[in-house]
Amino acid sequence: MLDQRIKTNWLSLALPVFISLILLSWGIISKRKLLIIPGFILFGLSSAFFVIFQRLVYYKTFTLLFAAIGIFSFSWLLLFVFLAVIRKTTAWWALFVAAISGAVSLNFLISKQTLLTFIFSISLAIGIVFLLWGTRKRAIGLLIPGLLVSTIGAGVFFAWNDPVEKNGLQQTGTMLMWFALGWILIAVISKIFSRKFTWWPLIPGGVLTMVGAGLYIGGNPDNALGFFQNTGSIGLIMFGVYLILLKYGMKNK
């Protein structure tokens, strides 16, 4: 009624935002989890809805989507921070939502969005949260999905993102090599969290490496020399990282 009388065209949209801020303030002051969580969720949803449908400023649709989903992501990030500070609890589920929605929002800044860019950004976001969680808990069981999800997303993106490249064998080989990298990194990083080197991830990593290398070279034999030079350099770097981790593990014994 008031919105129709003063003809603001935004008051009705802003009302849920005001309600969420009141709910948030009440929850923060009282330190009640049952008010903080719905307060932040309502704030994120209502703010995103307001940004998309408001008529105060006019921007391109993709810009509005970036801002709306970005605010939604930021609200979940604030929820994660406030629960950690006020309630002394680490709500990793909130960080997952924040990271995934943030990754989606960033895609709307790209001039050309494709399914592959969404897959890459979302998988990278999920992987980073798992890696942070696993590092915080010092749990290899959380690092495994983090490394695998990240490298799988990267493999799909870098293998199939080039519209000019039409060599299916070579692209499949590239994808499998990225998959293999995830398993190999699990074996390398495991030295930080355990006193012994975890060998079993090298089995799927080695199989995927051989199959991927065979497909990559079979797709274009002219790339064989450059391929072995690059993989040799990467192998030396990973061996150096392993030696550093080995020394680090010995110091902690």
Where in the sequence are the language-model features?
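Alpha-helical transmembrane segments and their membrane-interface anchoring/capping motifs
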Residues: 1-253
